Design a protein with these regions (language model features):
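Active-site-proximal loop and beta-strand segments within enzyme catalytic domains
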Residues: 33-35
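Zn2+-dependent metallopeptidase catalytic core
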Residues: 1-8, 43, 47, 153
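Acidic/His/Gly-enriched intrinsically disordered linker/tail segments
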Residues: 16-20, 38-41, 45, 57-162
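Auxiliary, metal-adjacent structural segments of Zn-dependent hydrolase domains
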Residues: 1-21
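Short carbohydrate-recognition loop motifs
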Residues: 24-27
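Short active-site segment of divalent metal-dependent hydrolases/proteases
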Residues: 51, 55
Length: 162
């Protein structure tokens, strides 16, 4: 894609199904989805990528952790089970601040980021989530630093899920 270059297929990332560049949504063809996806998964990816496009309208400089978290939370995030913690570690704070898509994927971003948005929504309300998307200003939205919110979320993951 334009965002990552033509090297993406060479990385062997067969999970790659779609993307957005601003408000333009790019998807793998449902008629030829490749080996990792089927027609129905392409249909679900449409909503996910449209959420990204809408978030991009709200804030074109949004952090990857937030935009993926919102897109997964509102569209197709898999349910989270505490047993996952036996196999995958909660992403480190520095990983949640990276805008590198490979870092995001490798640290478990697709497993965890929607739980971050879920935590913010349940704890502070959807209006605060929307404000955070627009401003990226944790202090203004929550009267707490980004790191403090991260630590609260880790506590939520460790204690909320059964």
């Amino acid at each position: 894609t334009k965002k990552y270059g033509y090297g993406v297929p060479l990385l062997g990332r067969d999970w790659y199904i779609g993307d957005n560049i601003g408000t333009d949504v790019i998807l793998t063809s449902p008629a030829n989805p490749g080996e990792a996806h089927d027609y129905d998964e392409n249909k679900y990816a449409v909503l996910h990528e449209i959420v990204h496009a809408y978030v991009s309208v709200m804030n074109p400089d949004i952090d990857l952790w937030l935009t993926e978290g919102v897109a997964l939370y509102l569209s197709n995030g898999e349910p989270f089970y505490k047993e996952y913690l036996e196999y995958v570690a909660i992403p480190a704070y520095k990983d949640t601040t990276s805008n590198n898509p490979l870092t995001f994927s490798n640290c478990g971003g697709y497993t965890f980021s929607h739980t971050y948005i879920e935590y913010l929504d349940h704890t502070y309300g959807w209006d605060r989530v929307l404000k955070l998307i627009s401003t990226k200003n944790y202090e203004e939205c929550f009267n707490k630093s980004k790191k403090e919110i991260y630590e609260e979320w880790v506590h939520y993951i460790d204690n909320y899920y059964q």
